[in-house]
């Protein structure tokens, strides 16, 4: 795989990331592995795998063992870095400054109430879980050769309780 298409990390740009992020990204870059290939090796979704790298998802014991193997990181060291609970949401300033992340924020800002209205009509009064949740990213090319990002969010519907 070409180095040109690998997500890397400049830790100086992300002061709030955990120490594990620097270790994981360095090993990923050294081995020239994509999130897709790492995810396949550990049996996880590529977005979930990337979330572990950014300290936004909890790695299981099995994840840690497989990551240590595929990235050739000392298991005990990786376990010491990843055994705690993630401090989610802390790693990014708000609003985000990265253009792609800002566009995701902008989508929710512009269409959030429309999503809410349609979901309420389909499911009733409630919320879509970001805990019982999965997401995928696919690449689609149209007949004119234009590339499109297809992002799917799948969250369990949680109706509000009456009390």
UniProtKB/Swiss-Prot annotation:
Its EC number is 4.2.1.104. It comes from Ajellomyces dermatitidis (strain ER-3 / ATCC MYA-2586) (Blastomyces dermatitidis). InterPro entries: Cyanase, Cyanate_lyase_C, Cyanate_lyase_C_sf, Lambda_DNA-bd_dom_sf. GO terms for biological process: cyanate metabolic process. This is Cyanate hydratase. NCBIfam families: cynS. The active site is at 103, 106, 129. SMART domains: Cyanate_lyase. Belongs to the cyanase family. It catalyses: cyanate + hydrogencarbonate + 3 H(+) = NH4(+) + 2 CO2. It comes from the Eukaryota. Keywords: Lyase. Catalyzes the reaction of cyanate with bicarbonate to produce ammonia and carbon dioxide. GO terms for molecular function: cyanate hydratase activity; DNA binding. SUPFAM superfamilies: Cyanase C-terminal domain (SSF55234), lambda repressor-like DNA-binding domains (SSF47413).
């Amino acid at each position: 795989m070409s180095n040109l298409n690998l997500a890397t990390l400049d830790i100086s740009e992300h002061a709030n990331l955990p120490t594990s992020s620097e270790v994981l990204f360095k090993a990923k870059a050294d081995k020239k592995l994509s999130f897709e290939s790492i995810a396949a090796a550990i049996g996880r979704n590529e977005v979930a795998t990337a979330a572990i790298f950014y300290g936004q998802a909890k790695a299981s014991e099995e994840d840690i063992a497989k990551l240590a193997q595929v990235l050739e990181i000392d298991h005990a060291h990786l376990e010491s870095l990843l055994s705690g609970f993630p401090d989610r949401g802390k790693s990014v300033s708000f609003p985000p400054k990265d253009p792609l992340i800002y566009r995701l924020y902008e989508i929710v800002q512009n269409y959030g109430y429309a999503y809410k209205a349609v979901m309420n009509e389909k499911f009733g009064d409630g919320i879509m879980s970001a805990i019982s949740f999965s997401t995928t990213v696919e690449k689609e090319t149209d007949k004119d050769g234009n590339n499109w990002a297809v992002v799917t969010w799948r969250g369990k519907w949680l109706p509000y309780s009456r009390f």
